[in-house]
Amino acid sequence: MSKSLVSQIAGTALLALMPFAALPASAPPKPYVVLDKSLSQLRADFNANVGKVRMLYIVGPTCGICLRGMSDLQETVYSKRGDDPRMVTFVVHVPTLGAREANVAAASRLISNRYTTHYWEETGITGKLMQQVIGDDKYVWDFWTIYGPNVIWSDEHLMPAPSFWQHQLDGLPPEKKLEPYVFAAKVDEFLAQVSAASATSTAATTGGKSE
């Protein structure tokens, strides 16, 4: 995806931070899901796709570096694998850098994939829970994870530990900085564990979405 499109979306996100009028009653459906603090919908979607490779990203929809990360993964992962039913992606947008719900729709355009669901989570609890999982002392966002097909989100108060993760934050291990091609190769490693036939069957019963 071109830098110009990322810049355009970043500009749109900043404009959305300005006061805006209420949407008309005929507004189209939102291209994202609004989560409550319990993250129950995200947890249900995650567990509904056990048996597949699941990516979970925690991003700020007004963060230029996050937008670049999504654009890079669109190029290295999604554009090369198409709508592979063996992999499902959850993109959780959190309120960093003054972001709010109005910023999510534009940012969601950066990853184009049938099996990707975007979420808005206004409390920021997602990053706090992931912070607990990795045992760090700073809030976690701009964070990119992969979960293997057998991982289950069993504890409603704690997120499962990622099978693999990278980041774009200062203060976390530099050797785990997001490298889009390394990340894509790791996705391929996990995909090799999943039967295409079983994933297709699951996709058919769930309508091809993670909701």
List PLM regions with ranges.
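Short, internal strand/loop/helix patches
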Residues: 108-138
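Loop/turn elements at helix/coil->beta-strand transitions in domains of secreted/extracellular proteins
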Residues: 51-54, 84-89, 112-117, 141
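Solvent-exposed loop/turn segments at secondary-structure junctions
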Residues: 61-65, 94-99, 122-126, 151-153
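Thiol-/selenol-based redox modules, centered on thioredoxin-like
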Residues: 142-211
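Structural microenvironment flanking redox-active thiols in thiol-disulfide oxidoreductases
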Residues: 67-109
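Short active-site neighborhood of thiol/selenol oxidoreductases, capturing the structured segment around
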Residues: 49-64
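Bacterial N-terminal signal peptides
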Residues: 10-21
